[in-house]
Amino acid sequence: MKLYRMITLVAVVLMAMSGLAQQATMTVKTVNHPWTVTVTALSDDIVRVDVMPNDWKGTKLPTLACDKALNGRVPKVKINEGTQVSTMVTENGLSVKVLNSMGLIKVGHGDADYLVDVMPMRDSSRVVLVHNAGESFYGAGERGYSFNLAGDTLVNYNTQNYGYQMGEKRTKLMGITMPMVISSKGYGVLFDDFCKSSLVVGGQQLEYTSTTPQPISYYVIDGNGRVENVVKNFTWLVGRQELPPLWTLGYITSKYGYRDQRESEGVVDTLKREGYPLDGIVFDLYWYGKEEDMGRLEWDKQQWPDHRKMLRDFKEKGVNVVTISQPYVLTNGRAIDNYRLLDPQGIFCKTDGTDTTHTVTIWVGQGGMFDVSNPATRQWLRARYKSLTEEGVTGWWGDLGEPEKHPLEIRHYNGLTAEQYHNMYGNDWSRIIYDLFKEEYPDRRPMIMMRAGTAGLQRYSVFPWSTDVSRSWGGFQPQVTIMLNSGLSGLGYMSHDVGGFALDENKKRDGELYIRWLELGLFSPVLRTHSQDLAEPYHYTEYGDLPRRIICERYRWLPYNYTLAYENASQGLPLVRPLGFYERDNNIKRFENVSDQYLWGHDVMVAPVMTQGATSRNITFPDGTWVDINIPSNRYNAHTTINYDAPIEVLPLFARAGAFIPQASYKMDNVGDYNPSKLDIMYYMSDEPSEYTLFDDDLKSTGTLAEGKHRLIRFAAAPATDKWVITIKGEGAGTPAKKEYRLMVPGLEVKPSQVKVNGKKVKLNYDPTIPVLRIPITINDINETTTVEIVK
């Protein structure tokens, strides 16, 4: 048989002798099979593969990719039309080879193939990709059973797990599932599909099967051997989270639930009286009445006689209010009026094949379920959210959004079955609130708490949490793994109910657990205590002022944490990062079994104590030299393990040698007291050059990144044989140019002979008892270089 092939370049314009095409799409109509392979380069590091039957005429579902990725710069590629094989290569060396006869696809970098698509279109709802032996895989959304997902079957069907604990197999499937994984070799795969599916992560293959009504497409995301780069590229593809409201980086109190206005005001007053900083309070379902009133979505006047005054008073105290809503409108309570109003409008989900609202039964009653795929539903919810926001509600909490109860008999307005639409429900629900803020309050940064969704959820300013975890040591222990896998999946703000939510009636109170959990919360993206009872830190008086000191410490780290938020918004980097995040070429694997340590940004390592009764723990150190922040004279080398003393008041915490850690060392009642122009800059000495970039903007506007209304302040250290030279220089605008810094050098055991600032000697302020060197610096124009010399 004569070999026939067809290579179609979309809008082909070949550049003479160069092999470059202006458009980055290659289409191969296979010879021996009735399907067409289309390869599209979305960037120099990302390719999309579509394998479509030639006679397929179905409707394409929405893609998981964001508009920016789909409509961005068209990358330049080289396309070669071989006799047997057609090849596309991006400028970064990512190559896709298609066997013209049958459409077999190989994707790789350089001479190495990462993946081979061995079964194109044999079954349009199934994709099998062969990978190299010995790889580990991470991500896939909120997964708590293990950090390394290799050898597992990952089901993608969002599921609530009430009261879960470490080691339970149900933690393999949680509230936010994503059809994606990242390989330890530094590449990732995203299947462009939100329907119910499974991904078998085998020893040498990824087998993906879905209920989707369309052929499965997928993206291969190259990181050039580094997981860090894969995360950057993946979040560019599906969207990144914008800068958060600053108050979300403070302390938030929450409970199931504050039952009335008097109790809520009492909690706020007690926290303030006891000296706790406070930035938010979360109202569970009692704000609208009782459990059976779900879907009422208006303040209960009996329990909250003057909620408007309460909201005003809280605002004056710097306390933001977050209120809950759910997908259901029940008919066995006072939400019946809303049900009767909305049912004739087609707002609720229908039974498949009928025009009848499908009755959904949950744990407190029955009623209708909002069909958020319906424009009428979105319009009604948006109007209700707007009216409550106008009254003073600051943030929104979407609960039960898996959806927790989603009968299979439902057919959604968009034509999809419950199984097909289930995972996307949380994304579309979040977008209702996000769009409200973008269009009605464009200068306000939204705070949206959601516990369910799929890939790209973060682009709607979502602050997820790990749902109703058990208040137990077993519930505490998987939280690091959950934050790690979620963070690699784009969910940079994944957090947890600090203290544990689901109570054991036989042991409601465990002070040691609460303190250790609070220590983990100190270095979690959101510090929010939440439980069914005894949620607030002032209940644990047996530990004196330790709970207050932990929460106050959160505020001292605001400048560092806000810079992490900038890194997340600008690069997609999670706040919580695995120990091997900066390793390359499979070296991340050496740390994948360390499930109770993590990097907090690039320069800090956290090792929480997560075992009951423990007063010490083993600690493993990744690449670099690490300085004990608690005892800065102690240093540890890479790839070593030590046993570290950690009584209840000690959180093991380490800084990378050479790190600059900005801190706000003054008392705050809330983040409104934060002054980014008055900071301590902790420099942890190193014999190697180092640098750090501090982010500085007005702390509130939504356009500071896009409009360039911010400063990047760079700190650099250049050690020499006889001194350390430190330079400070900013660039940009939009914030005060004058800065009052205090450069702190902890762990400096020998008093320096002199210190100079911009060539002038300054008085030595050296305390040998800590030891620490303090250098006050007044900078009149941060965009001018300031030079500090510490002479040995």
Regions found by a protein language model. Name each.
Residues 3, 20-247, 254-256, 260-269, ...:
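N-terminal accessory segment at the very beginning of proteins
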Residues 1-8:
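Bacterial N-terminal signal peptides that target proteins for export
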Residues 5, 618-625, 758-761:
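Short alpha-helical "patches" and their helix-cap loops
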Residues 8-16:
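Bacterial N-terminal signal peptides
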Residues 113, 117-651, 655-656:
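Catalytic-domain carbohydrate-binding cleft regions of carbohydrate-active enzymes
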Residues 16-18, 561:
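N-terminal signal peptide c-region/cleavage motif recognized by signal peptidases
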